[in-house]
Amino acid sequence: MSAKVPSNATFKNKEKPQEVRKANIIAARSVADAIRTSLGPKGMDKMIKTSRGEIIISNDGHTILKQMAILHPVARMLVEVSAAQDSEAGDGTTSVVILTGALLGAAERLLNKGIHPTIIADSFQSAAKRSVDILLEMCHKVSLSDREQLVRAASTSLSSKIVSQYSSFLAPLAVDSVLKISDENSKNVDLNDIRLVKKVGGTIDDTEMIDGVVLTQTAIKSAGGPTRKEKAKIGLIQFQISPPKPDTENNIIVNDYRQMDKILKEERAYLLNICKKIKKAKCNVLLIQKSILRDAVNDLALHFLSKLNIMVVKDIEREEIEFLSKGLGCKPIADIELFTEDRLGSADLVEEIDSDGSKIVRVTGIRNNNARPTVSVVIRGANNMIIDETERSLHDALCVIRCLVKERGLIAGGGAPEIEISRRLSKEARSMEGVQAFIWQEFASALEVIPTTLAENAGLNSIKVVTELRSKHENGELNDGISVRRSGTTNTYEEHILQPVLVSTSAITLASECVKSILRIDDIAFSR
């Protein structure tokens, strides 16, 4: 009797994994196609209405995808890729999604030829690694002291935004902000040291950089307290200067006016004691954290503080505490017994200023050794939509400069690096054998989606432009790309259309990793 042959049903149904892969690729590509029109300086903007009824107008890839109601789990992976690009490079969030979509299209064509998805994924990874090497060969080294080059890179980032007409003003502002908090030896920049403060009123031209700290809260003047302090000693407190309340709900029954008088006297003595301890520590500017349980500071305490000539700013948000303690060099104080002079920050000047119809408190000349260099940028605009988009654009420009601190190399923009990588990979693929040659060829073709999209969005003939670029790169003109200003191809490096090399290397690496993850999925199971 012959032995029973084990069942091989798992591998008999080959259609299901193919269908799942096809559905995943279609879902992911539909997301890429949705934001493809917003790439480049002539790219369109998207208007998004949030579930809360807010209106957002933006052409920042990450912002658009983050707000879109995407249900398909694989399509959500593209949102995560965009978020990863945003945190790694800050710019190129649209490019990375378009590139992922194009690589998935190439993978679909290869799958239809019967090539195994794991082989495709691994070859894409090796092609991406080679692409990064080519980009690093192409890049022009840049020094942080070369301010002009940094400004040009920031201007290129701003050129595709609504605020592009203000790029000559915002780009130097972004460069100066980053250079203030970094030095020639820095390998990274913490953008949390740059505080973007949004204030409605005025125009984008009124946006200013302040070397110090800006508070959106105003000084309290109701009790006649000061609004300007020179040689300031700043205290940041997290307790309330108001009568204490018990934790449990209870009532106090007063049946004699003398008892009432005693309660009021105790209250005065309690508050006066706190105010005297603050004055004893030589504090003359007091920042008080917002409280939801009771008044952060009551009228009687304000009266005492104004008599002691102490400037008071209340309602400091919990999220601001870390930045303020870092920027002012003061330590947050949670109890009056811990209020000592060594926990205070010091500054040359703290003053409330009137800026375009709204008041802000400005702290300049911070002189504490514990303080890290911080910069505040006050963003102005006619309405919240413009201010929000200006903030996003400025964040992208700051990220571009941060990229140049991390990896000090600039490459030409306008699709020039993608065309060059495509040409070099195609050439190398011809000398390969077997399936890998096919896959590298498809990877090279997929990279041309960036210059093609730039040309289409600029209203140019994409086939003619990309063919022209190919022949120019074949003749050794490595920096030739698409210039929207000239409505054709030109040396984009000489036209000052520049981008950090880290933006492109990060986009290609992340796109190939995402494609690898998607191709390796052969089934979707829903848990209960």
UniProtKB/Swiss-Prot annotation:
Protein origin, superkingdom: Eukaryota
Chief place of localization: cytoplasm
Locations listed in the record: Cytoplasm
GO CC terms in record: chaperonin-containing T-complex
Entry keyword set: ATP-binding, Chaperone, Cytoplasm, Nucleotide-binding
Coiled coil: none
GO molecular function, one term: ATP-dependent protein folding chaperone
Record-stated family: Belongs to the TCP-1 chaperonin family.
NCBIfam families: chap_CCT_delta, thermosome_alpha, thermosome_beta
PANTHER family in alphabetical order: CHAPERONIN
The protein's name in its UniProt record: T-complex protein 1 subunit delta
Organism: Saccharomyces cerevisiae (strain ATCC 204508 / S288c) (Baker's yeast)
Lineage summary: Eukaryota, Fungi, Dikarya, Ascomycota, Saccharomycotina
